């Protein structure tokens, strides 16, 4: 049997951290077993779908390096890959369930359903159980009501059964059929509900293993019921634990203190491979506690048995550490492929070399680029106050000896060292006066590099009065 996994988002929002991790674990599992990873779009709820939701899902998965073998647009025997293109299939199968006695029409209006709920609450039943009254009506009455076209189709749950599965993450899980209400499989608008459509899709696409969030645990017995009604083989399920913030609370899209969507991290310029690596460790560990993996080694190492049963903490500092580590080891030319700087390639290369070790993301390069691309016209009051208290001798010597004709980093650096030896000073006493006079700030990269990057025209103008 070929391993086939899937990630099946709804285009009701952009790719969330939790969804990305679900996609990644399904992808890693499939690739570890030389299987296929499928991207399917669950777009049956038109009222909630947003513009570019599907596009965001696909583009950000590709940015992460999670490449589907099949996706919307693929021409295979398993498609189509959007639920909105399979409505006839769902409706046909729902009719089959009715014929087999596993489903039935229900004609309740909202008021009648609310009355049922109130009556059950009064009896101490707080988890709604549908009363199956419509199973008792005559065929004549049923046909009459069907003409009005106001009905849903409900699945008839076998109350005598226990619905059990051996969860790939959590072990044996069981639900009593008596605790599950007869649930809607086809809504009044003719569209399938999630729990019905997802089973049909997984069967049609021959999905063998499903890793998903723990919020789907309560959906699983309903889905198993559908598989059993059709006598279809049930895939293996694994339910992942939640991802939490620093306070131990589940990540919420409403929490503005942390970016929740992959697009945010992409736009900030985080290293995609670093994010891929970091995401894999949110709920999975390698046997030897290794943390750095390239794409291929992570696929090779992935073992679902090492998926955590405890919640995973989204540590932004750890992500920053990963991204910084990846960027620091990249070839300079690869970094430059991701940046748009000046027209001077020699300057660009020196600039990247200067800030490579300190940059967490590509946005950090741009932030530093602004300092040199749009240099200050004068020293601000705070810096001026610091500068006035310093000995100006290092500045005067530097201004008189700097070689503008042969603008060279090594010569600038050697001159600074020479001044230190001549005045018998080091550290802040040597560097701070020159730094403030040349860069108009008291911090930054190595001084000689900052001076070279600012360029001889700007430095000559700033040092003119100190000659």
Swiss-Prot record:
EC top class, as a word: ligase
Alphabetized Gene3D superfamilies for the sequence: 1.10.10.350, HUPs (3.40.50.620)
Known EC number: 6.1.1.17
Chief location of this protein within or outside the cell: cytoplasm
Any Pfam family the entry gives: Anticodon_2
GO cellular component: a single term: cytosol
CDD domains assigned: GluRS_core
Superkingdom, natural source: Bacteria
Chain ranges for the short sequence motif 'HIGH' region as given in the UniProt record: 9-19
Keyword Aminoacyl-tRNA synthetase: yes
Compartments it resides in: Cytoplasm
PROSITE patterns: AA_TRNA_LIGASE_I (PS00178)
Keyword Aminoacyl-tRNA synthetase: yes
Job of this protein: Catalyzes the attachment of glutamate to tRNA(Glu) in a two-step reaction: glutamate is first activated by ATP to form Glu-AMP and then transferred to the acceptor end of tRNA(Glu).
Protein family (similarity comment): Belongs to the class-I aminoacyl-tRNA synthetase family. Glutamate--tRNA ligase type 1 subfamily.
Subunit structure, interactors included: Monomer.
NCBIfam families per UniProt: gltX_bact
UniProt-listed HAMAP family: Glu_tRNA_synth_type1 (MF_00022)
Annotated protein name in UniProt: Glutamate--tRNA ligase
Lineage of origin: Bacteria, Bacillati, Mycoplasmatota, Mycoplasmoidales, Metamycoplasmataceae
